[in-house]
């Protein structure tokens, strides 16, 4: 039987009443730490892109738990910092690019042997600039330099591949970025850039709005001409060493959404975007003959 001196017992009792049990742990902190260090992880889904990822209950972590290899964050330059949100009205000084994405990614990479996923799958952070492109890039570039140990970068035209690839979308400061002798980010092109002679390390991705290129929205079979055009776009991008992404595809659970996702996957589109993490994860795993709880390793194609 454990004996405790009366005075010490009273002290411990009062202390526990004031601050809670000595062994109590903040569940939120414990849960987030587990996300960073847990050796068991979801199967990496190289085609899965989390559109407006910051809208989820736990930005970044919900996407990682579902195996997403690409996430998107909209940013505004406010008083020298990059705040994350879709509009000025929803910005919060505590929700920054560093706090929501760069810091937790760096923690995970350090804990995971230099990778976001243990199998080494490429991970993309798409930064959609909503404020002035040039002014925001200057701040973003300095910020990214602090995280260079995990970031793919280009020095004097030579690519140094690392765990996380940053791509800038939205208001893109093309000239300033292109002239930067050391870059920690590439730039998101458009379909009009498909045959551009810009190097793939400067423009590693081609993205555009789905209904600007296609009329088909998942109802009935995809017309042969549009199916051929989709494959042509992917082939042309591959020829120039670039990846492909479309935004604003159907995203409400429906046969139409499944039909569009199926065509994107069959054509080899690299990033399939969604707000429905569970839905896209389940779809991609079903195409791979796996379950949502699979804990297996897959190989991925190395990209810039």
What are the roles of these predicted feature ranges?
Residues 2-11:
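Bacterial N-terminal signal peptides that target proteins for export
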Residues 56-61:
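A structural motif detector for short, solvent-exposed N-terminal "entry" segments of globular domains
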Residues 10-21:
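Bacterial N-terminal signal peptides
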Residues 24-45, 62-69, 76-304:
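Catalytic cores of phosphodiester-bond hydrolases, prominently lipid phosphodiesterases
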């Amino acid at each position: 039987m454990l004996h405790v001196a009366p005075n010490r017992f009273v002290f411990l009792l009062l202390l526990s009443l004031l601050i809670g049990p000595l062994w109590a742990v903040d569940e939120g902190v414990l849960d987030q730490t587990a996300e960073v260090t847990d050796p068991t992880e979801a199967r990496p889904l190289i085609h899965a892109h989390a559109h407006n990822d910051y809208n989820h209950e736990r930005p970044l972590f919900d996407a990682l738990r579902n195996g997403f290899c690409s996430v998107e964050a909209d940013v505004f330059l406010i008083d020298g910092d990059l705040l994350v949100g879709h509009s000025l009205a929803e910005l919060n000084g505590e929700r920054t690019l560093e706090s929501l994405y760069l810091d937790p990614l760096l923690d995970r990479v350090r804990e995971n042997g230099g990778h976001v996923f243990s199998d080494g799958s490429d991970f993309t952070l798409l930064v959609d600039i909503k404020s002035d492109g040039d002014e925001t890039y200057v701040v973003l570039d300095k910020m990214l330099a602090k995280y260079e140990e995990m970031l793919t970068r280009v020095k004097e035209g030579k690519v140094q591949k690392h765990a996380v690839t940053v791509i800038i979308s939205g208001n893109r400061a093309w000239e300033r970025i292109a002239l930067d002798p050391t870059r920690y980010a590439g730039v998101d092109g458009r379909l009009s850039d498909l045959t551009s002679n810009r190097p793939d390390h400067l423009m590693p991705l081609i993205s555009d709005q789905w209904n600007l290129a296609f009329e088909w929205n998942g109802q009935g079979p995809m017309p042969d001409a549009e199916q051929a055009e989709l494959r042509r776009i992917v082939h042309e991008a591959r020829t120039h060493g670039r990846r492909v992404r479309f935004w604003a595809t159907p995203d409400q659970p429906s046969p139409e959404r499944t039909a569009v996702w199926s065509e994107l996957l069959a054509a080899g589109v690299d990033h399939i975007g969604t707000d429905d993490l569970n839905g896209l994860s389940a779809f991609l795993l079903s195409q791979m003959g796996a379950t949502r709880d699979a804990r297996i390793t897959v190989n991925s194609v190395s990209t810039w």
